[in-house]
Amino acid sequence: MLGFGPFELILIVVIIALLFGARKLPELGKGMGRGIKEFKQEMHEPSPPRPQVTDIPSQRLDPVTGAPVSTESTVPASDRRS
């Protein structure tokens, strides 16, 4: 499919050297190596278990403060009219 010959590979290396500069190439390679190493480690290590979702009744939140809004009336029972 993508058969790169020696000329294409040399051309790619020259373009990369022009873009990043000769001084940055070792740092670029080191960073890529670390990234690949971390990726491989993550692939081999099992992921930690996910926390269980519990059924917590949802509360209404005040749109301004974000604080839970009480569903109970704030008027004392003696002041209520029936």
From Swiss-Prot:
Protein transport among keywords: yes
One Gene Ontology biological process: protein transport by the Tat complex
| Keyword tags | Cell membrane, Membrane, Protein transport, Translocation, Transmembrane, Transmembrane helix, Transport
| Keyword Protein transport in annotation | yes
Segment Disordered: which positions? 36-82
Q: Where in the cell is it found?
A: Cell membrane
Which positions, given as ranges, span the membrane?
1-21
Query: What kind of membrane protein is this, topologically?
Result: Single-pass membrane protein
Composition-biased stretches, type Basic and acidic residues, lie in 36-47
One Pfam family recorded for the sequence: TatA_B_E
- Write one Gene Ontology MF term: protein transmembrane transporter activity
Q: Name one GO cellular component term.
A: TAT protein transport complex
Looking up InterPro entries in the UniProt record yields: TatA/B/E (IPR003369), TatA/E (IPR006312)
Functional description taken from the UniProt entry: Part of the twin-arginine translocation (Tat) system that transports large folded proteins containing a characteristic twin-arginine motif in their signal peptide across membranes. TatA could form the protein-conducting channel of the Tat system.
What family does this chain come from, according to its entry?
Belongs to the TatA/E family.
Alphabetical list of PANTHER family matching this protein: SEC-INDEPENDENT PROTEIN TRANSLOCASE PROTEIN TATA
Describe its partners and assembly state.
Forms a complex with TatC.
**What is this protein's record name?**
Sec-independent protein translocase protein TatA
